A protein has these predicted regions:
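Long, terminal "pre-/pro-" and other extracytoplasmic accessory regions
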Residues: 1-85
Length: 85
């Protein structure tokens, strides 16, 4: 079984592979599922706003991704957008 540090590193590596422009990557949440089968890792990163007006007003906005990793092998099973509403 991989440990929490390894799960976090693998999630960060996966994020950077698909979003090389991701800046200021931070760990937000990490959880081992009750059955100990998966690690759920939530990362945030600074993203440039899509609109010029928003960029001028707020600059960078935080984006969130949640990763599901197989706790035994460390394989990334999924990456999803995490919205806070």
């Amino acid at each position: 079984m991989i440990n929490v540090q390894d799960a976090t590193k693998r999630a960060k590596d996966h994020l950077r592979e698909f979003f090389p422009e991701a800046d200021e990557v931070q760990l937000e949440e990490v959880e081992l599922t009750p059955d100990k089968a998966y690690w759920l890792v939530t990362l945030s990163y600074a993203g440039v706003s899509n609109s010029v007006a928003s960029s001028l007003l707020v600059g960078k906005s935080l984006r969130y991704k949640i990763f599901k990793l197989d706790a035994e092998s460390g394989e990334v099973i999924s990456m999803k957008v995490r919205d806070f509403k």
